């Protein structure tokens, strides 16, 4: 059995998210359907590195599938993009070790969150950034961001998953949370060893409340200590969030 790795970019605006859901259109579903047609199979199981919610975008989602035969990958690459909607693109198709798993072999991920801070929203950014209309103190924002880096129990910043249970291990390491200037606003860059459900959006929501003086910066450590989602702020909207890249140990994407 051979394993193949896809690197995928998509505009999540018109989808219910990555994961297949009943009576809804998902990115995973669209790609699986295209693979079934091209590989002439009734079922192909595509496994993503993690799910993204409705309205969330990706520049570097990773997924894998298994197939019993060798595949002409150049032809498959072109054919997939020919079948898929224009808001989903396959950036690369690669053979990897049969032991590769897009989720469990990942060692870290990078997300970006885009903020639009101008008084008037740029209509061309409305689906790809959060139009934040309160005045903010960027220096406070940067100081608050530092408090999230390192290894923490992120229970207070994680929603329960759809299955009704929180992650078994809420401890994650955030290697960096950088605040960068971006056209019309700011870009928040997150890189960590893994992220809980809605963790990035919940952190952004809390950071923006602190930066706009709605909450005090001293509350952040209290929120961590509470281990209670209700203590953090509301989640930032999905449209500003992008999955940028998933990192693996080896070039072929497989851990030794």
Swiss-Prot record:
PANTHER family: PSEUDOURIDYLATE SYNTHASE (PTHR11142), TRNA PSEUDOURIDINE SYNTHASE-LIKE 1 (PTHR11142:SF0). SUPFAM superfamilies: Pseudouridine synthase. GO terms for biological process: tRNA pseudouridine synthesis. Belongs to the tRNA pseudouridine synthase TruA family. Its EC number is 5.4.99.12. It comes from the Bacteria. The active site is at 53 (nucleophile). The keyword S-adenosyl-L-methionine does not apply. This is tRNA pseudouridine synthase A 1. Formation of pseudouridine at positions 38, 39 and 40 in the anticodon stem and loop of transfer RNAs. Gene3D superfamilies: Pseudouridine synthase I, catalytic domain, C-terminal subdomain, Pseudouridine synthase I, catalytic domain, N-terminal subdomain. InterPro entries: PsdUridine_synth_cat_dom_sf, PsdUridine_synth_TruA, PsdUridine_synth_TruA_a/b_dom, PsdUridine_synth_TruA_C, TruA/RsuA/RluB/E/F_N. Keywords: Isomerase, tRNA processing. It is an enzyme of class 5 (isomerase). CDD domains: PseudoU_synth_EcTruA (cd02570). It comes from Protochlamydia amoebophila (strain UWE25). GO terms for molecular function: RNA binding; tRNA pseudouridine(38-40) synthase activity.
